[in-house]
């Protein structure tokens, strides 16, 4: 798949001096290695200083510890490789069913769809490998489901909920960064409902994620892997990182700077169930287009400015007009257009939401809107 494209980071409140923020999906290229510390031609030699000659016994895991979480989750996280001739890419995935259904990011496997015609190989924690095929994709949400061939004894991951997460909550990330399968990192939830705009690795189609932000180390290859709570329950799908841009022309991706983003599992699980049952997913729509804020510009007002309203759509039926400014969705403050897109996409078609709207006269009122749904078109 090659290095994924960098995309625009969410607007920040202050300029960065001497360093640009870049946001990238975190699938990795095959064959790049970890860097000069690893030599693929010869094994690394590690010299132990003062080590005892007897083999130490594993330390028993403390209940609720990262060690216990890792032991529970690792068998349910896989490494995914997509090969297209001499090119390839890699990422991670989580096990949904004993017979081989796996959840991952669309950008991990999209190059194996349609004319891409790449071959997908999945490797389990025990080293077992098998081919896989795409069940369905939703590029707009960066979600895909694939199925590993000839499986019946996989260990599905425990599904949690992203509805009651809290900033500061401890979390664990599991995946295959830089091809290092079964890597476990830990951190906290740094923020919730973070609008994150990313570009697809192959198609270039953008996704706006309503993301969980974490400082757990996430690197290229972690895409599609698990973000879990301290009960070992899946709460998010790791998808993107922010990194400091450099002047390098090599195309290499930067690593973690403590700004990782995951798709909340409640949204991902709704979509994966639609993909499994019908092969396509639906997306909630408000029926508006939004005035974009130029990249790098600071907003002069708070809210998402409505540029146009689709006749007969949900916003039109609620009396929202072009030029209006949406400042809240339910109790959530909407500072800009990406925030409105992320908030709407976090809902399911048919959900009724409350919008706080400022009209052209400066007056503010609240309207109830029932979201419509559209089918996301994406080939297998």
Model-identified regions with their sequence ranges:
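C-terminal recognition in membrane/secretory proteostasis and scaffolding
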Residues: 1-44, 133, 270-380
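A conserved glycine-rich beta-strand in the N-terminal activation segment of trypsin-fold
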Residues: 12-20, 60-66, 81-99, 129-133, ...
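Terminal peptide-recognition signature
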Residues: 30, 34, 75-80, 93, ...
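N-terminal activation segment of mature serine protease catalytic domains
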Residues: 30-92, 273-277, 377
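Interdomain regulatory linker/hinge segments that flank or connect interaction modules
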Residues: 38-42, 51-57, 239-291, 374
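Conserved active-site neighborhood of the chymotrypsin/trypsin-like protease fold
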Residues: 82-89, 97-182, 338, 343, ...
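Active-site loop architecture of trypsin-fold serine endopeptidases
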Residues: 84-89, 108-118, 154, 174-186, ...
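Short, conserved beta-turn/loop elements at beta-strand boundaries and strand-helix junctions
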Residues: 98, 137-141, 192-198, 239, ...
């Amino acid at each position: 798949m090659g290095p994924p494209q960098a995309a625009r980071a969410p607007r920040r409140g202050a300029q960065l001096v001497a360093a640009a923020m870049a946001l990238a999906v975190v699938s990795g290229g095959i064959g790049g290695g970890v860097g000069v510390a690893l030599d693929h031609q010869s094994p690394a030699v590690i010299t132990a200083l003062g080590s005892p000659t007897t083999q130490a016994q594993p330390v028993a895991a403390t209940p609720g510890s990262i060690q216990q979480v890792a032991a529970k989750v690792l068998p349910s996280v896989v490494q995914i490789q997509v090969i297209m001739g001499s090119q390839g890419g890699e990422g991670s995935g989580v096990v949904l069913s004993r017979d081989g259904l796996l959840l991952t990011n669309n950008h991990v496997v999209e190059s194996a769809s349609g004319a891409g015609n790449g071959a997908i190989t999945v490797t389990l924690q025990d080293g077992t490998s098998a081919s896989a095929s795409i069940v369905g994709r939703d590029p707009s949400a960066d979600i895909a489901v694939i199925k590993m061939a000839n499986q019946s004894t996989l260990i599905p991951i425990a599904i949690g909920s992203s509805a009651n997460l809290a900033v500061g909550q401890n979390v664990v990330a599991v995946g295959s960064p830089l091809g290092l399968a079964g890597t476990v990192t830990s951190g906290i939830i740094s923020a919730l409902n973070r609008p994150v705009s990313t570009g697809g690795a192959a198609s270039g189609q953008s996704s706006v994620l309503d993301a969980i932000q974490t400082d757990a180390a996430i690197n290229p290859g972690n895409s599609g892997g698990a973000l879990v709570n301290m009960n070992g329950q899946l709460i998010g799908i790791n998808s993107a990182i922010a990194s400091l841009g450099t002047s390098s022309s090599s195309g290499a991706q930067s690593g973690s700077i403590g700004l990782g983003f995951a798709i909340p599992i409640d949204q991902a699980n709704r979509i994966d169930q639609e993909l499994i049952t019908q092969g396509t997913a639906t997306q909630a729509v408000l029926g508006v287009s939004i005035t974009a804020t130029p990249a790098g510009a600071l907003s002069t007002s708070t809210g998402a400015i409505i540029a146009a309203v689709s006749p007969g759509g949900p916003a039109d039926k609620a009396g929202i007009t072009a030029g209006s400014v949406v400042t809240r969705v339910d109790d959530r403050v909407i500072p800009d257009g990406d925030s409105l897109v992320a908030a709407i996409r976090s809902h399911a078609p048919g959900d009724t939401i409350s919008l706080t709207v400022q009209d052209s006269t400066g007056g503010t009122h609240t309207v109830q809107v029932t979201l419509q749904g559209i089918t996301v078109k994406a080939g297998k």
